[in-house]
Amino acid sequence: MLSSCVRPVPTTVRFVDSLICNSSRSFMDLKALLSSLNDFASLSFAESWDNVGLLVEPSPPHTVNTLFLTNDLTEEVMEEVLQKKADLILSYHPPIFRPMKRITWNTWKERLVIRALENRVGIYSPHTAYDAAPQGVNNWLAKGLGACTSRPIHPSKAPNYPTEGNHRVEFNVNYTQDLDKVMSAVKGIDGVSVTSFSARTGNEEQTRINLNCTQKALMQVVDFLSRNKQLYQKTEILSLEKPLLLHTGMGRLCTLDESVSLATMIDRIKRHLKLSHIRLALGVGRTLESQVKVVALCAGSGSSVLQGVEADLYLTGEMSHHDTLDAASQGINVILCEHSNTERGFLSDLRDMLDSHLENKINIILSETDRDPLQVV
């Protein structure tokens, strides 16, 4: 009897171990998940006016088993979040944008925050960081046009300077004894990186010194150089720029491999966005048979991004009445699909990309209730 009781134990242990292993693959620490999300698309790509990143954080430690994707976080969507027991909401649009002076039950956005915290649900928003990203919303929107090459309309700047500091100081030193003194002084300033090389000015051998400086270090460098009139008069100070990124930025200017009629392009866009109707403003002198070769697009609200861009067609979610008139007067066709209709379909692609990026460590689900508030009736 004792022997028969002992035998099942290893099987039970293996079963429990299996559950533990599976469980460990189904959770991520919130901080680790946020780091991975930033690796996927850096929040540094977001516009300066935007409110992105972690907006609501439950008290730590907080682990995430289910990540819930939605374009807009409404109260109806929050009900779905709670029913599906999600731990973190990725809301493309930030539900908190303007500063809140109080958290009460009076407004719907305040209620979202209360319900999230009461139920230990975090809220994260990438918004314009995903607009700019190479694998982001605008690239997804461009997929509906057909074969084309595209580039950002307004390229993003790299998040960091290629070298230490944001200023470069350049000057020549004539004599060996001066060189040793100068090199010793500038190398002793924090936030300065130094390079030097031989240079000839006329018939005179000199040493060219380049200093890459932080803003704080620049003031100390200038203070040192200004004590030597001869050095200071030969000094050049350059303000460095962060380089532009080739595939990252706002909007996309797309050149089709082959021109198509406007009517054909309309059909393609409807299929891609799964819409039965769109709004069209024909450019002056254009018809449905006019050819389209270049498309400028911007998911969401495209007025500021598309303004002044030369193209056969503007594609966006919404544009002001007067901006539409301006574009049409220049012979540019305008297609408007409602704001979130040009964004929401990206979430299906995002789910697949995040599954791969996060190595299937957590469950990722799409909202079934999220939808554009405007309907054609």
Curated annotation (Swiss-Prot):
One term of GO molecular function: identical protein binding
InterPro entries registered for this protein in UniProt: DUF34/NIF3, DUF34/NIF3_animal, DUF34/NIF3_sf
UniProt entry keywords in alphabetical sequence: Acetylation, Cytoplasm, Nucleus, Phosphoprotein
SUPFAM superfamilies for the chain: NIF3 (NGG1p interacting factor 3)-like (SSF102705)
Pfam families for the chain: DUF34_NIF3
Subcellular location: Cytoplasm; Nucleus
One of the protein's GO biological processes: negative regulation of transcription by RNA polymerase II
A cellular-component GO term for this protein: cytoplasm
Coiled coil: none
Region described as Mediates interaction with COPS2: 244-377
Residues modified as Phosphothreonine: 255
Modified residues (Phosphoserine): 259
List of residues that carry N6-acetyllysine: 109
Family that this chain belongs to: Belongs to the GTP cyclohydrolase I type 2/NIF3 family.
Function: May function as a transcriptional corepressor through its interaction with COPS2, negatively regulating the expression of genes involved in neuronal differentiation.
Record-linked NCBIfam families: YbgI_SA1388
Subunit field text: Homodimer. Interacts with COPS2. Interacts with THOC7.
Protein name per UniProt: NIF3-like protein 1
